[in-house]
Amino acid sequence: MKFARTIRFDKSDLNIFPVAAEEGELALVGTFSFNNIQNEDLKGKVKQAFSNGFIGCSSFGYSTLVSLVTVNEDDLINLQYSFGQYFIEHYGAPSKIIAEKAASEEIKFMSELCKDHELGSLLSVSREWSEEGIKEKFRNLPKADSCAEQKIWTVVDED
């Protein structure tokens, strides 16, 4: 099954988000993490996380980009359990059953988002406030051809 894993090309995420996700952790869309924030409260690093961040599933930090990878069913079961615990501890979910159901819905949403894209491609998210609430847009950046196959210089004999 395809799923998202955080990826970092440079150190910018470390500087722009309140907490940056670790590279290589599974990720969810994470819009739920902004449910209790009003538009006027979005400033600085929190605004950046709101506008362009996926949430990492181990650190609960944010990542600008995710790469599509293959995961197995056990990975997703473990993710459902750990995110269920996170919903109880940080969002006050009233029970383990309700928390794990919410986690399962978030996992399903990410799986659906990933399923039609090629492994190795990248996804980005863009969020904004609208009259109906939070509006999300996703962009797929197709997998680039291997750099090894590209000619980056030419050797010229000198006389």
Predicted regions and their residues:
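N-terminal accessory interaction module
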Residues: 1-66
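Charge-rich, solvent-exposed alpha-helical interaction surfaces
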Residues: 45, 49, 53, 82-86, ...
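Amphipathic alpha-helical interaction segments
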Residues: 57, 61, 90, 94, ...
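A ubiquitous short alpha-helical element
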Residues: 67-73
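Short acidic alpha-helix initiation/capping motifs at coil-to-helix transition points
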Residues: 75-83
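Intrinsically disordered, low-complexity regulatory regions associated with ubiquitination proteins
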Residues: 76, 88-89
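Short, surface-exposed acidic
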Residues: 89-104
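Alpha-helical oligomerization segments
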Residues: 107-159
